[in-house]
Amino acid sequence: VTVKHLSFTYKDSKVPAVNDISFSIPRGSWTTLVGHNGSGKSTIARLLDGILLPNDNPRTVINVDGIELTEKTMWDIRDRVGIVFQNPDNQFVGATVEDDVAFGLENRQVSRSKMQTIVHDVLEQVDMLDFQKSEPQYLSGGQKQRVAIAGILAIGPKLIILDESTSMLDPAGKAKILSLIRDLQNKNGLTIFSITHDINEAVQAEQMLVLDKGKLLASGSPREIFENEVLIKSAGLELPLFYKVKNELIKKEIHIPREVNSEEKLVKYLCQLNSKM
């Protein structure tokens, strides 16, 4: 994904929701866009999928999987991009789980025999095959998100956008969904663009983008971003617990090796350090 000089202003506003931002997402990578509520994150998701069209600017480029987004290529882009939204109930259209997953395939005139094979395969991938005859409204929040993900997988996207898709789940449910997404990414060679205000979720990414008031403040690895406390504060975000503790230890002149990059590794390292004292 390549984005250049992207801006967007809603009709009822004089202030751009997205203001001249540029970034790229490497194929097969996991990139997370972070920012507080109202920073423009969800607007960017809708611009990438062609749900919204950017302000008219000859310098603006949105390129997904080698296709530049225009009014003529909008549907080609949408075939390559799937969005999992915050509330899966808003995405359900089928009476049963299998009907809902098949909906996108029906719109693409996929044959019934092929459709059945695809639905079976994607439900198996998200561990929801036993619920294929169930009504979506009776599923748990995590199960609903799994079905929503299956519906996206069915159309064979190159890019999956997670738009605050775990924000309504408890910590355990959130961890399971993120682990599932990572497994699916590795299995299917997917590119993941995660949009969140949850800093702990952002740690999983290879690349982070920090957005504030529609402007891109910084991009880099999670390590590079989280070690910049001034940047995090200016964006109105909080550091994950690991980086809070690590930064305080560094201030006290306690050396923390680069390979210590998680809470588990930090606890182990400090225990080893303590045993040597």
Per-range role (PLM):
Residues 135-139, 143:
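Conserved ABC ATPase signature
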Residues 113-131:
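Conserved ABC ATPase "signature" region
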Residues 49:
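Helix-to-loop junction immediately C-terminal to a conserved catalytic motif
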Residues 57-68, 77:
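Conserved ABC transporter NBD signature motif
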